[in-house]
Amino acid sequence: MKKFSSKTIKAKNSVKMTALSTRAIAANLILQVLDEGKSLSALIPEVQLSVKAQDLPLLQEICFGVCRVLPRLEQIIKRLVDKPLKGKTRIVHCLLLVGLYQLLYMRVPAHAAVDEVVNATKSLKSDSFRGLVNAVLRRFLREQDEILAIIDKNWQTLHPEWFVNKLKKAYPNWREIIEANNQKPPMWLRVNSQKNALETYRTLLEEQGVSSKTSHHPNALCLDIPIAVQKLPHFEEGAVTVQDLSAQWAATLLEPKNEEWILDACAAPGGKTTHILELAPQANVIALDVESHRLKRVEENLERLNQQAIVVCGDASKPDEWLAEIGKSAAKFDRILLDAPCSATGVIRRHPDIKWLRKETDIAQLVELQKKILSALWEKLKPNGVLLYATCSVLPEENCEQIQAFLNAHADAELLSLPFSDDKSAVGFQFIPQPNSGDGFYYAKLLKRAS
């Protein structure tokens, strides 16, 4: 099989987003994920103004798709290009990833996909690569069956080895988690019970030709086919919120009551804050997050649902600082929702770039941060108050092991049972990602005993 050489070709990989094609922008974003450790969730909003509205779904599909199946695409390139495209030529490597993803996974005519990617070399100031890109993609089309037979001979996880090893240790059904992660996520809605009954809103969807199914959660609907949020009936009026099924249990398990003081720690982007206020509209809610720019999303969601909360920028591990700033130094809370900073390994199917951004060394640091926040907020919980600990992780060290260590260190902490857990010996409850169901999520509900 012929390989193509890149050894005599040079290109720049620093390009402006203006006037770039969608494929060129996708290659640039993928480059920033792989080489600079940036997340697609942060990058895509930054370039939305540079992309036509009708092309934004294409950009998202390419970027998230490439990250989802990255190892497979990398192996194909390795078989077709004899020398790695490094340094200033990395942008062309990412452009090949874009082209191969389209050829393998998208309903784009092969000739059109190749032509678009080849033409993108010019706007990326890599026109000297035009011939290489064209030759690699066209040879792949000719020899696709042979190449894939070799690459796919062994079962591929499409995940980093360190993560697979952790799953094998923790879960007998670890392959199910891997397979769910490699699929596109379902679109779940949370129906605002202050506006509509679940079946009433489901009927509104059906009237627009949108089919859905219910679940074991009283406010959740799963769309059979995802649609743009702008097409959801009465979305702007706050009738519905896009939120994963597993995440919808947070406010439900917290059981907020009107007039209570409730802290939503690590609140951005505000899905759980608004759900708390749907369940208890007269509750006094503080929505806290350490990143000020992410709190803008909280404020936007509160405004859309016509709700009120105290939105605070502060470090959850240092509550005395931000409580003093808002004039509530002596305040203690009836309930605390701690959706702790975590590895996000339970939401890989929604954010496949996590597979390549997260490092094994991150886990110990996150565990220590969770421990610090948990202990600090426990001091701000009233006697007989409830703290709900949550993560979107599937790793035991962040979840059941973290909570067991906390229980061992705090005699006033009592683990409460959860309605969907039959195992009385379990420390909290772990959702794993499943097709047509929720993401990976962990919950533990703690009562602070009165002394």
From Swiss-Prot:
One of its GO terms (cellular component) is cytosol. Keywords: Cytoplasm, Methyltransferase, Ribosome biogenesis, RNA-binding, rRNA processing, S-adenosyl-L-methionine, Transferase. It catalyses: cytidine(967) in 16S rRNA + S-adenosyl-L-methionine = 5-methylcytidine(967) in 16S rRNA + S-adenosyl-L-homocysteine + H(+). One of its GO terms (biological process) is rRNA base methylation. Its EC number is 2.1.1.176. The active site is at residue 392. S-adenosyl-L-methionine binds at residues 266-272, 289, 315, 339. InterPro entries: MeTrfase_RsmB-F_NOP2_cat (IPR049560), MeTrfase_RsmB-F_NOP2_dom (IPR001678), NusB-like_sf (IPR035926), NusB_RsmB_TIM44 (IPR006027), RCMT (IPR023267), rRNA_ssu_MeTfrase_B (IPR004573), RsmB-like_ferredoxin (IPR054728), RsmB-like_N (IPR048019). Its main location: cytoplasm. GO terms for molecular function: RNA binding; rRNA (cytosine-C5-)-methyltransferase activity. Gene3D superfamilies: Helix hairpin bin, NusB-like, Sun protein, domain 3, Vaccinia Virus protein VP39. The keyword rRNA processing applies. The keyword Cytoplasm applies. Belongs to the class I-like SAM-binding methyltransferase superfamily. RsmB/NOP family. Specifically methylates the cytosine at position 967 (m5C967) of 16S rRNA. This is Ribosomal RNA small subunit methyltransferase B. It comes from Haemophilus influenzae (strain ATCC 51907 / DSM 11121 / KW20 / Rd).
